[in-house]
Amino acid sequence: MPENLKIEVIPEGTVIDHIPAGKWLKVIEILGLTKPNGGTLLIASNVPSKKLGRKDIVKVEGRYLSEEEVNKIALIAPMATVNIVKDYKIIEKFNVEIPDEITGILKCPNPNCVSNHEYVTPRFHVESREPLKLRCHYCERTINEDEIAQNL
């Protein structure tokens, strides 16, 4: 293994890179990886990064992410990069993107919102990406970046 390699290479699975330092735990919670599932989970935290200063990396062996999971990651790590690995090689690499409309991922923090009492799927529209600000489709409550993680 090369001297500069600090985290093991995975044979198959997903690597989520450029997660802001300290947010790896929220990423694995979003993906439901806090419980043992038989796969290997590798985490590098507070790694030097030219892009972010410091970053976290999460490697999930034997698992590929759904579009919904990638969208959730984009909400807490908008500069993250997802790498798909097969036979120890990166076969696909893409940046996460926040969609214009977010459906069924977040819950509205407004206790009076119809989405918290009726059988309707929560929907949010992106008001701004930098800083991230979302607006509920039903009650028009605005959610700021710091409120998103607690409403996933």
Swiss-Prot record:
The keyword Nucleotidyltransferase does not apply. Its cofactor is Zn(2+). InterPro entries: Asp_carbamoyltransf_reg_N, Asp_carbamoylTrfase_reg, Asp_carbamoyltrfase_reg_C, Asp_carbatrfase_reg_C_sf, Asp_carbatrfase_reg_N_sf. One of its GO terms (biological process) is pyrimidine nucleotide biosynthetic process. Signal peptide: none annotated. One of its GO terms (cellular component) is aspartate carbamoyltransferase complex. The keyword Zinc applies. GO terms for molecular function: metal ion binding. SUPFAM superfamilies: Aspartate carbamoyltransferase, Regulatory-chain, C-terminal domain, Aspartate carbamoyltransferase, Regulatory-chain, N-terminal domain. Binds 1 zinc ion per subunit. Zn(2+) binds at C108, C113, C136, C139. It comes from the Archaea. Keywords: Metal-binding, Pyrimidine biosynthesis, Zinc. Contains catalytic and regulatory chains. Belongs to the PyrI family. Involved in allosteric regulation of aspartate carbamoyltransferase. This is Aspartate carbamoyltransferase regulatory chain. It comes from Thermococcus kodakarensis (strain ATCC BAA-918 / JCM 12380 / KOD1). The gene is pyrI.
